[in-house]
């Protein structure tokens, strides 16, 4: 019996997805859907391709679904093709010198000379122009939003994978708490997270960290690029950590205080984050709307603070709708989007990042949740608290 190298969804799960995509094609009058993925956001810009194929790739990849042919993925880099064949649940081919030309020729070869083509993702302008110039019979329609709505409701298999990603994330955060100490560099904190994640079998997705003195002047939100700053006693460290099970990540945020309890300002920031978090979690259930979430977030401004990062976002795999801030932060984050209604088996991250107006101080608290029939289940096991280490 051969060893299983990578996690795989069942054939039934992939067939369910392909059926849903083909129904989208019927509804929108499409002859084919071309799904684009890149290595952005630590490969989570491959989320749509992963949904079709189970391949978590790098570089530019295109998955093609038609009505009558089995789905196929075109992998841009020739040396990535063997690995794609080890993990993909669909046919894999090389994308050739130009994936745009290869995809176009494939569609012609299967009889779609004058095709209405739905594309998904941030397709490069070079690809789009190549389709226009070299395949003038194609009519192209952006169906990204419609396609991603298919991914909002998680299947039982997806929920199982997300639970595993959340457990990996908890493990990595616990390693950070155990290993963090004054004298380390910020980037060395990232090493603690990655080592724990990889040694447990998880894939590091992201670890955003920021450190600074409680007296102010540090970053109010976790940094996407870890600095060389030396950790000192009295610091606060804000965290955003995601570790995945073959792309399906958890996501959690907790502040860590080095050697000292939070001062009065940071205690008020924490108390506000916790209260807004609990208010939000309380309203989450099928039928709840983005207005309910905005109501929960009003307490942040009432306490004299604002937010930098979003208040709630959809998740799994990668970012999904909705993306919700607070009413009072619309001037800095843009206006609220259209009304969003939550449904059972959606996954969302509740993540209040409560900051001072001058953004010289802030904390972030967050967890990944599964919307259940009667509420919301937290998928993380790390206690709902701030952590003081080295005291």
What residue spans do the PLM features occupy?
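Active-site neighborhoods and metal-handling regions in enzymes and metal-associated proteins
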Residues: 1-391
């Amino acid at each position: 019996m051969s060893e299983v190298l990578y996690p795989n969804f069942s054939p039934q799960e992939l067939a369910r997805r392909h059926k849903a995509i083909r129904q989208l094609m019927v509804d929108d009058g499409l002859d084919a859907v071309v799904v684009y993925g890149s290595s952005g956001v630590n490969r989570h810009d491959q989320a749509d391709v992963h949904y079709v194929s189970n391949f978590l790739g790098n570089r530019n990849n295109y998955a093609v679904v038609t009505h009558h042919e089995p789905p196929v993925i075109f992998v841009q880099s020739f040396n990535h093709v063997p690995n794609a064949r080890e993990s993909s649940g669909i046919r894999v081919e090389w994308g050739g010198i130009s994936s745009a030309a290869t995809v176009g020729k494939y569609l012609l070869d299967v009889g779609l000379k004058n095709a209405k083509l739905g594309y998904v993702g941030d397709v490069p302008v070079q690809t789009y122009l190549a389709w226009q110039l070299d395949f003038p019979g194609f009519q192209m329609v952006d169906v990204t939003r419609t396609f991603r709505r298919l991914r909002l409701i998680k299947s039982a298999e997806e929920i199982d994978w997300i639970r595993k990603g959340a457990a990996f994330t908890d493990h990595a955060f616990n390693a950070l708490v155990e290993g963090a100490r004054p004298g380390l560099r910020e980037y060395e904190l990232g090493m603690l997270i990655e080592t724990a994640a990889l040694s447990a079998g998880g894939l590091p997705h992201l670890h955003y960290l920021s450190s600074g003195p409680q007296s102010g002047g540090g970053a109010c939100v976790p940094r996407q690029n870890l600095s060389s700053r030396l950790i000192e006693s009295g610091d606060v460290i804000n965290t955003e950590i995601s570790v995945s099970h073959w792309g399906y990540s958890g996501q959690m945020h907790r502040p860590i205080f080095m050697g000292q309890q939070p001062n009065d300002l940071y205690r008020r920031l924490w108390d506000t984050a916790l209260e807004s978090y609990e208010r939000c979690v309380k309203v989450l259930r099928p039928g709840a709307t983005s207005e309910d979430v905005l109501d929960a977030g009003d307490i942040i401004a009432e306490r004299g603070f604002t937010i930098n990062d979003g208040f709630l976002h959809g998740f799994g795999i990668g970012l999904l709708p909705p993306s919700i801030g607070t009413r009072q932060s619309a001037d800095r984050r843009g206006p609220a989007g259209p009304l969003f209604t939550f449904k059972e088996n959606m996954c969302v991250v509740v993540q209040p990042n409560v900051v001072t107006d001058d953004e010289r101080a802030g904390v972030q608290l967050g967890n990944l949740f599964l919307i259940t029939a009667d509420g919301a289940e937290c998928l993380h096991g790390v206690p709902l608290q701030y952590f003081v280490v080295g005291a």
